[in-house]
């Protein structure tokens, strides 16, 4: 039987498993690849292939993550699974594996546990938009009422963190039994895959979002004007369109009078491309690295925000000592460092290397930002932490 070849035309969706240690995240990941490969074609991945997660670096932080891929009839999924709790925290905060949706695994034998709560909170803070629940190990629970109780607890916990706990899908299954090929439990994996397809909307592609280009360099070309260079993060900029220069200084409007790539002139610059954009009426000294070029009105400059951060441990090349309130590091956004002060939550006196913490940050210059923007925390050019803007304040 010939397998159909992988079609690039299918929408691509990023998902991942989250949840408490030993609740079966990796077993479920293996079960999904195995059952879907058997049902729709594709390749299965064994538990130990997934559990042996390779190290990767994101924003100077080493994270162990496993990536698997699988297909449903309508979509192609890239799925991330992490072996340890600390890897999840780092992964979610750095955005190393951006998730369009997550599968929260809860063992029916235990119900929600401390890391279940922490992963849900992190999901809320870092902007995981959709959660589907897989209640695992249901083959080990005979009492229907107990299953009802666990499901209710999980739904209430999700609602407490502003997810639609009453409405989101919950699948009761057994990853291990599905992996062993028991039809009744394999059907639950197919049911879960159906919810991935129907409950997680197709993500908006970067190219369809409003134009944004983080400025890396500025040149002036005699007789032509000022050119800014950088990689288009999202959207499209066309010659003749109005753009705004946002961040650090007051916002200024200009017009794009040319786009070039590899010294060739283009009509437009698109998401993912490294381009030079020629700006009308802008002096070389009016614009600097760290600002962004954006579609007018699409992004505002801010100095104050609530954030979720991970502080590197000593072994990861981070600080050797804790820090306290009044700590003033640099916050590296996109292409530049900005000094900021921090405020710790009530009852938190100090932050140790290896901790993750919620903190309020006030920057000395405004930066173009939206909720979900990633940043690094640096001291003299050395990365000591990573963070994400949970909520813009001012």
Swiss-Prot record:
One of its GO terms (cellular component) is cytosol. Residues 19-26 are annotated as: G1. Residues 10-204 form the tr-type G domain. Belongs to the TRAFAC class translation factor GTPase superfamily. Classic translation factor GTPase family. EF-Tu/EF-1A subfamily. GTP binds at residues 19-26, 81-85, 136-139. Monomer. It is an enzyme of class 3 (hydrolase). Signal peptide: none annotated. PROSITE patterns: G_TR_1, G_TR_2. GTP hydrolase that promotes the GTP-dependent binding of aminoacyl-tRNA to the A-site of ribosomes during protein biosynthesis. Keywords: Cytoplasm, Elongation factor, GTP-binding, Hydrolase, Magnesium, Metal-binding, Nucleotide-binding, Protein biosynthesis. PANTHER family: ELONGATION FACTOR TU, MITOCHONDRIAL, ELONGATION FACTOR TU-RELATED. Residues 136-139 are annotated as: G4. InterPro entries: EF-Tu_GTP-bd, EF-Tu_GTPase, EFTu-like_2, EFTU_2, G_TR_CS, P-loop_NTPase, Small_GTP-bd, T_Tr_GTP-bd_dom. Residues 81-84 are annotated as: G3. It is found in: Cytoplasm. One of its GO terms (molecular function) is translation elongation factor activity. Mg(2+) binds at residue 26. This is Elongation factor Tu 1. The gene is tuf1. Residues 60-64 are annotated as: G2. Its EC number is 3.6.5.3. Its main location: cytoplasm.
């Amino acid at each position: 039987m010939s397998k159909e070849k992988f079609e690039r035309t299918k929408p691509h969706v990023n998902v991942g498993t989250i949840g408490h240690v030993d609740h079966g995240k990796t077993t479920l990941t293996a079960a999904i690849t195995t059952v879907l490969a058997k049902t729709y074609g594709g390749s299965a991945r064994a538990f130990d292939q997934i559990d042996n997660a390779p190290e990767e670096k994101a924003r100077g932080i080493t994270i162990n993550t496993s990536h698997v891929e699988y297909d449903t009839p309508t979509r192609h999924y890239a799925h991330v699974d992490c072996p340890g709790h600390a890897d999840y925290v780092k992964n979610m905060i750095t955005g190393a594996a951006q998730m369009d949706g997550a599968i929260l695994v809860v063992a029916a034998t235990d119900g929600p546990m401390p890391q279940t709560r922490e992963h849900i909170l992190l999901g809320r803070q870092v902007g995981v938009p959709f959660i589907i629940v897989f209640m695992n190990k249901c083959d080990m629970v005979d009492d229907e009422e107990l299953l009802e109780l666990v499901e209710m607890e999980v739904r209430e916990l999700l609602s407490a963190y502003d997810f639609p706990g009453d409405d989101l899908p919950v699948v009761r299954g057994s990853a291990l039994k599905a992996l062993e090929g028991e039809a009744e439990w394999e059907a639950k994996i197919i049911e879960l895959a159906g919810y991935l397809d129907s409950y997680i909307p197709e993500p908006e592609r970067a190219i369809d979002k409003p134009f944004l280009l983080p400025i890396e360099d500025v040149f002036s070309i005699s007789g032509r004007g000022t050119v800014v260079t950088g990689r288009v993060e999202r959207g499209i900029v066309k010659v003749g369109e109005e753009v705004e220069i946002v961040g650090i200084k007051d916002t200024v409007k200009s017009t794009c009078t040319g786009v070039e790539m590899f010294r060739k002139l283009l009509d437009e610059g698109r998401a993912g491309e490294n381009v030079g954009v020629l700006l009308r009426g802008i002096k070389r000294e009016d614009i600097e690295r760290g600002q962004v070029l954006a579609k007018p009105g699409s992004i505002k400059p801010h100095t104050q925000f609530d954030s979720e951060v991970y502080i590197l441990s000593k072994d990861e090349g981070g600080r050797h000592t804790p820090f306290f309130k009044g700590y003033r590091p640099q916050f590296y956004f996109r292409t530049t460092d900005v000094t900021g002060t921090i405020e710790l939550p009530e009852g938190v006196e100090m932050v140790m290397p290896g901790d993750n913490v919620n903190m309020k940050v006030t920057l000395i210059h405004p930066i173009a930002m939206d909720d979900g923007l990633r940043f690094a925390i640096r001291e003299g050019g050395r990365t000591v932490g990573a963070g994400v803007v949970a909520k813009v304040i001012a």
